[in-house]
Amino acid sequence: MRSLLACGVLLLLMTAPALAADCNLTAPDAASAGADCARAWMDQNLRLNDIVTIGTHNSYKEAIPDKIMALIRMGARKSADGLDYSHIPLTDQLNDGARAIEIDVVYDPNGGLYAHPAGAAMVGLTLPAVFADTMAKPGFKVLHVQDIDYRSVCPTLVACLQELKAWSAAHPDHIPILVTMNAKDDEIPFPGSVTPLKFDTAAFDALDAEILSVFPRDQIVTPDVVQGDFPTLKDAVLQRGWPTLGATRGKFLFALDEEGDKIKAYQGGRKSLEGRVMFVNAPEDSPAAAYLTLNEALTDTAHITHDVELGYLVRTRADADTVEARDNNTARRDKALASGAQYVSTDYMQPDDRFGPYQARMPKGFVAACNPKRHPERCAGLPVEAEP
């Protein structure tokens, strides 16, 4: 019996990953750190911005109902084509390797503003009672375009965040997941359409509070964490850099993907983003500059690479408006993955059988790899996060 137990312990020791103490964490690359030491080496020697991974665009979006899509197509065929995509539930996306999620939110502090979509009424659709009940509750709602493109895998922000948090709890070693948010408040030219409430500083205060109602601050890479004791967030990013990969595994960072007045409203007079939950898409000359949305991978390639090499975190897109999928055109995808942008967003982690084989995934089946513009030789071709 003791012999069997001893054999079992020996087998466990032989197959378990090496402890950090057994690894050469000052080795020049992950492969030289010792047997089973790549993870420990990367966690200590790579920073959050030293990676590249794939995520999804408008991650919450379900397909527009056929009758409403037909109505849109009658008046604007090209717009209808651009809206003709959808996603599987967030949990399934994460299981498939997505490490960036995009959520569009509308402000609905009293509830009920989006409970009765005009498009559904116009074409005679009867919505499930649970939809109206859910949308009647106070809080931020998640949708693409009010009244016509309103279906979501998680109709409320809290539901989306709870799903992300639950997945993270079951997979605590994941690389930091980027959650970008669009704050939607544009009107649309549709009969009977809702007029969205505008995003002012009070609305953004409520948005931060709703995020913190689900995620504790210690599970979020906040601007304050990155800034530390530097005068500005930009100074911290360019002079010291982002936290290490090891310090950010199992965590999330949130970014407000907006410009101009919305960024000003979110900052609310702050020098950088002191006390805020989200980073903002601030221009490089802003004290709050740290994260940038540069979506045009074909034309912004040099800009993306330059900013990544400086130390900024960048999100770009592999495809848009179903164009690349319909044409099976991989040029934008390939440019995006090679540009250095840390988070590359797609609507097609899996192909859409209606269009063809186009999809956007990390090479070699990786979930995340060393960033191609930040000394990728350090990873020696090994994954930062392996296939799920």
What is each of the regions a protein language model found here?
Residues 20-388:
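Catalytic cores of phosphodiester-bond hydrolases, prominently lipid phosphodiesterases
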Residues 6-16:
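Bacterial N-terminal signal peptides
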Residues 1-4:
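Positively charged n-region of N-terminal signal peptides that target proteins for export
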